[in-house]
């Protein structure tokens, strides 16, 4: 093969989505070291959760792969925050770890438009004609019009087990030794980040009777609407740390490479190691931990919330201080990994390098944390790389479109001083960009971008035509002088209750009934959110000159610190600062209003 439209470097979650998206346009090469590691879940065996499931639903709506893989290998599904409103409800799918990777490999390796190329990227060279050559360590020069670098935690990766380190991108896998150099020489500022993973414990050595069992939802949910047949087969469990856990950690902090100063990389604020939790939250006498199976008939469980870089002999002692783990045997020890990332403010909103036109980056190389964030970036980078290689018009997914737009906007305009994790609190107007309406919002966009087929778009259009027919049926029929939608707006009424009164509805699937119910019950709130969205365009131009940020108690601690440091001159500038969230902007607007009223009186 003399060349490709796009070469994707890396077979993790970002690389998979990039190759999948780019292959919808033209032929793609996926450059990987070991095919057996493609699609691997190196950390938790699950997809979704608050802020993250919304990304997966949006990736699915845009023709992506992750939601499909998660559903096909699901062993446990749960809607989190189910008792709260739809704006913050999130699906979490527990997966069969090995099956997820195997299914990903089946899909990618079986795709006629994706060529699998084995090797390690050593350099990126311009071909002098607007394209690129990916030079491998064995001297091959692979030609492409565009390149997506999705190197994960592998660029100059180092793993840490206590004070001992190894050159690895993750456990047992060699790092990418040379790829940082061409990025740095082009002008990219490289930073060192750190993340970690918990230990895996032999399941037959755990006393599950001492743990709190968390069953799967009886009616399984999926990202595609079709979770696999095993989606309710396995529970998860909950345990917690003890005072003895905390005592051991405090007494052995000198064994931690982070606290000893060996690790330079910045770790994730919202997913701290167990050492960090004990030190930063010393006033807590316990920390909750979740025990997740690696599969239905697994020999291992994953100890969510217990990531660590302490040495193996200490991990053995620590795990045995947990209820139910008194006889625990660790099969794979926890470790930390330190790696290079680019400064994401040096990218465009399509994740293209500002210094290397035609080179895109996606996933943890951009300073993010998590499978879902990586997949979302991979889809965008793969799509944009393919469109660029074909000379198609550049398309930008804006902040207002949903969680994916917020992710891109935050990375490019705010950047991050630590691994970035998507959360619902980062997103303005969450009621407008829920997980349940991702297809309605984004599938038409996916069709325009070339990511979604006419047939897929037609199915979504038909779905919401049926929802609209249901709404019209509610509005048309009256019981006891009130229309069906008026009855449904009552807090104590669900759609089934309205039907029990005698209101007749067309046949609707479960997800269509849910969409109809949300549309009716939250109509007033949704209209208000739309009006607020319009008014905020004006509010963002307001001046912050002379505002004493340190004196505004209602701001979050992080926002107060960042605002005082950066001294933004307008609300829009404040909103672009890493660590300043939508709630903080609301606090600033209230403060400005109070100042104006005070001056006027």
From Swiss-Prot:
PROSITE patterns: GIDA_1, GIDA_2. Keywords: Cytoplasm, FAD, Flavoprotein, NAD, tRNA processing. Its cofactor is FAD. Pfam families: GIDA, GIDA_C_1st, SAM_GIDA_C. Residues 233-242 have a biased composition (Polar residues). GO terms for cellular component: cytosol. NAD(+) binds at residues 267-281. It is found in: Cytoplasm. GO terms for molecular function: flavin adenine dinucleotide binding. FAD binds at residues 10-15. Residues 216-242 are annotated as: Disordered. Its main location: cytoplasm. It comes from the Bacteria. GO terms for biological process: tRNA methylation; tRNA wobble uridine modification. Belongs to the MnmG family. NCBIfam families: mnmG_gidA (TIGR00136). PANTHER family: GLUCOSE INHIBITED DIVISION PROTEIN A, PROTEIN MTO1 HOMOLOG, MITOCHONDRIAL. Homodimer. Heterotetramer of two MnmE and two MnmG subunits. NAD-binding protein involved in the addition of a carboxymethylaminomethyl (cmnm) group at the wobble position (U34) of certain tRNAs, forming tRNA-cmnm(5)s(2)U34. This is tRNA uridine 5-carboxymethylaminomethyl modification enzyme MnmG. It comes from Deinococcus deserti (strain DSM 17065 / CIP 109153 / LMG 22923 / VCD115).
């Amino acid at each position: 093969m003399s060349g490709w439209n796009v070469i994707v470097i890396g077979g993790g979650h970002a690389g998979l989505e990039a190759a999948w998206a780019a292959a919808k346009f033209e032929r793609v090469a996926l450059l990987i070291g070991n095919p057996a590691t493609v699609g691997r879940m190196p950390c938790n065996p699950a997809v979704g959760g608050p802020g993250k499931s919304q990304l997966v639903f949006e990736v699915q709506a845009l023709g992506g792969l992750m939601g499909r893989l998660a559903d096909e290998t699901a062993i446990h599904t749960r809607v989190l925050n189910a008792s709260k409103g739809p704006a913050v409800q999130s699906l979490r799918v527990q997966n069969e770890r090995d099956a997820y990777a195997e299914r990903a490999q089946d899909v990618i390796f079986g795709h006629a438009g994706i060529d699998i190329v084995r090797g390690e990227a050593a350099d990126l060279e311009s071909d002098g004609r607007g394209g690129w050559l990916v030079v491998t360590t064995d001297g091959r020069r692979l030609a492409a019009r565009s390149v997506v670098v999705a190197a994960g935690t592998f660029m100059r990766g180092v793993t840490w087990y206590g004070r001992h380190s190894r050159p690895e991108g993750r456990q047992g896998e060699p790092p990418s030794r040379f790829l940082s150099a061409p990025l740095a020489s082009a002008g990219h500022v490289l930073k060192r980040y750190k993340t970690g993973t918990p230990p895996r414990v032999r399941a037959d050595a755990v006393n599950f009777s001492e743990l709190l069992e968390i069953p799967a939802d009886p009616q399984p949910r999926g990202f595609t609407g079709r979770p696999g047949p095993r989606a309710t087969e396995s529970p998860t469990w909950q345990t917690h740390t003890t005072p003895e856990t905390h005592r051991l950690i405090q007494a052995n902090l000198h064994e931690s490479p982070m606290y000893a100063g060996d690790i330079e990389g910045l770790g994730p604020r919202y997913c701290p190691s167990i050492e960090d939790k004990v030190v930063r939250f010393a006033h807590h006498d316990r920390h909750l931990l979740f025990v997740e199976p690696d599969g239905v008939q697994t020999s291992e469980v994953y100890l969510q919330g217990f990531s660590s870089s302490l040495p193996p002999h200490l991990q053995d002692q620590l795990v045995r201080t947990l209820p139910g783990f008194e006889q625990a045997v660790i099969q794979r020890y926890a470790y930390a990994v330190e790696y290079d990332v680019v400064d994401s403010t040096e990218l465009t909103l399509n994740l293209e390098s500002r210094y290397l036109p035609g080179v895109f980056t996606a996933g943890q190389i951009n300073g993010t944390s998590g499978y879902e964030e990586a997949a979302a970036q991979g889809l965008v980078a793969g799509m944009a790389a393919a469109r660029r290689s074909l000379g198609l018009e550049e398309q930008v997914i804006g902040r207002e479109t949903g969680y994916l737009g917020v992710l891109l906007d935050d990375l490019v305009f705010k950047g991050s001083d630590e691994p970035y994790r998507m959360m619902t609190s980062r997103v303005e107007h969450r009621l407008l960009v829920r997980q349940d309406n991702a297809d309605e919002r984004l599938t038409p966009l996916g069709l325009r971008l070339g990511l979604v087929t006419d047939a897929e778009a037609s199915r979504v259009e038909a779905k919401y035509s049926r929802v609209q027919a249901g709404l019209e049926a509610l509005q048309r029929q009256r019981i006891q002088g009130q229309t069906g939608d008026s009855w449904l707006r009552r807090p104590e009424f669900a759609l089934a209750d309205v039907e029990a009164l005698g209101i007749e509805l067309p046949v609707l699937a479960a997800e269509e009934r849910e969409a109809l119910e949300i549309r009716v019950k939250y109509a007033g709130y949704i209209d208000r959110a739309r009006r607020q969205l319009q008014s905020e365009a004006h509010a963002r131009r307001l001046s912050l000159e002379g505002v004493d940020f340190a004196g505004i108690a209602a701001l979050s601690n992080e926002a107060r610190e960042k605002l005082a440091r950066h001294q933004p001159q307008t609300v829009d500038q404040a909103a672009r600062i890493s660590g300043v969230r939508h709630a903080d902007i609301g606090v600033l607007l209230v403060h400005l209003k109070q100042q104006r009223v005070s001056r006027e009186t």
